[in-house]
């Protein structure tokens, strides 16, 4: 399976996915996702530099300069599609990806790209997307503490146009928040990354998606090995 990774920052989830693919490839005979290209809207970001150092083709198109040159609002849906079309043109010269993985990509994708790659664009949220208390602009860990939660799960999900979250594919094991307070957001987020994100994202991409075990019907119901899952998706156990 050919994968294009979109990123904007340090690329820690990209690294986790790459390392697991390398491990699986070394074992031989197991299906895995090969990262064929990395795209970034922030040229020179740490994740892009990591990918280049690994010999992976890196494609960069500054979203800041793109929208500035057009003199248009970067959140305008039409202009969003212009940018996405330019990004896809660059990527598809390198490969025709079977899957697009958003790994800390800080731009919302438009309807054109998501329609063209329907059910083939995945993202990760460092919290439980089924919770009804989630708001934008506040760390998931802080929201969990405010809601009285003693633990948190992170979620791999499918991207959908005009929706914050599409259907959940996989959730991590609960990550304990015992002893943490709101002001400990940075420490909580690091814990969630190490005990949640870096475990389930590689597992979802390689073992479940590349392994051909996940399916989605027209009503956005998710199936694992032909069995319909609940709204929380598959519950990962490491």
At which residue positions do the language-model features occur?
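One-carbon transfer enzymes
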Residues: 1-238
């Amino acid at each position: 399976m050919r994968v294009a990774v979109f990123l904007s920052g340090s690329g820690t989830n990209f690294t986790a996915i790459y390392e697991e693919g390398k491990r699986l490839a070394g074992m031989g005979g197991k299906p895995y996702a090969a990262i064929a290209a990395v795209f970034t809207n922030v040229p020179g970001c740490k994740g892009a530099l990591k990918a280049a150092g690994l010999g992976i083709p890196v494609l960069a198109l500054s979203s800041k300069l793109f929208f500035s040159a057009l003199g248009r609002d970067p959140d305008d849906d039409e202009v969003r599609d212009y940018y996405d079309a330019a990004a896809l043109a660059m990527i598809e010269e390198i490969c025709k990806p079977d899957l697009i993985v958003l790994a800390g990509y800080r731009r919302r994708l438009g309807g054109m790209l998501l329609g063209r790659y329907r059910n083939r664009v995945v993202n990760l949220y460092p919290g439980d997307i089924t919770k009804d208390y989630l708001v934008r602009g506040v760390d998931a860990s802080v929201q969990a503490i405010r809601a009285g939660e003693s633990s948190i799960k992170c979620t791999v999900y499918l991207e959908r146009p005009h929706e914050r979250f599409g259907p959940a594919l996989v959730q991590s094991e609960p990550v304990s928040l015992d002893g943490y307070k709101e002001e400990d957001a940075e420490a909580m987020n690091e814990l969630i990354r190490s005990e949640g994100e870096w475990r389930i994202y590689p597992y979802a991409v390689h073992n479940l998606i590349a392994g051909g075990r996940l399916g989605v019907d027209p009503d956005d119901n998710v199936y694992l090995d032909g069995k319909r899952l609940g709204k929380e998706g598959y519950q990962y156990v490491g």
